[in-house]
Amino acid sequence: NKNFTVKLTGNGTYDLTGTGFRGINQLFDAKDSNLGDIKCDYTLSLTTIQGNDQTIKLDTDIKAYAVKITDNKSGSAIEIQDMDNYKYRTAFASVKGVGLINCSTYALTVNNLKLSGKISVKTYNNDGQSYVNEDLSTGGIVGGVQSSCTFSGITLTDLEIYGAYTVGGLIGKSTNNINISNVKSENSGVYVYGGFETGGLVGNSQKGNEFAVKDSKIRINKVEFANLDK
C-alpha cells in the first residue's frame, strides 16, 4: 500500500528550521508518471495527516536552476535554458508542487493541525535571473493536488509562502474538489507571494470542481504577485 496516514503526537513543536526539509511526497503526479526510462510507480503517497492540534514550523527553501542533462538514448548533452522546457515534462503534466505535502495524486485529508514558518520556491534561467515559471505550484499544506482534498481544524500562524507562479496559503493548485472548514489564523496570519496565480487560501482551482469554505476566519496579511525579488 503506497497510501499512508501520519498521526502527530507529543506536546512540542515539530520545528523544521535548518533541517533541509523539502516537503513530503514526490514533486509530481505519482499515479502513472515516468521520467524518461525511469518508472516512478513506487513513490510515497501520504494521504492523511491527523494533527492532534500539534504545530509544524516549516522551513523550506528550493531553488531550481537551468541545467545540462544527458539524453539516455542519444548520449548527447542537452542545454536546458528554462525549467519549463524540460525534455520529459510529460512526467509533470498533471499536478506538481511544493508544500508541507508536495504533490498528492490521491484524495488528501488534513485535520487539527497548526502550521507556521516559511516556504520559498524560486526558478532561475541560465543567466542566473529568477523568472515566472509555472512548473511548480506552492502551497502551505499542499503544492498540487489532483484528487479531492478536505482540510478542517487548521490554524495558520505567521505563515509565509513564496512561489514561482501558482501560490496559495493552503493549496497551490487543485484539479478536483476542495472542502475547507474551521480554518483560522493567529498573529500576523498569512503572507503569500506568487509569480502569477496567487491567493490567500488557494492559488488555482480548476473550473467545474466544488470549492467550499465554511466556519473559517483567516487574516490574510498580504497577497502579492509578479514580485520575483521576494
Where do the PLM segments sit?
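Surface-exposed repetitive/solenoidal architectures
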Residues: N1-K230
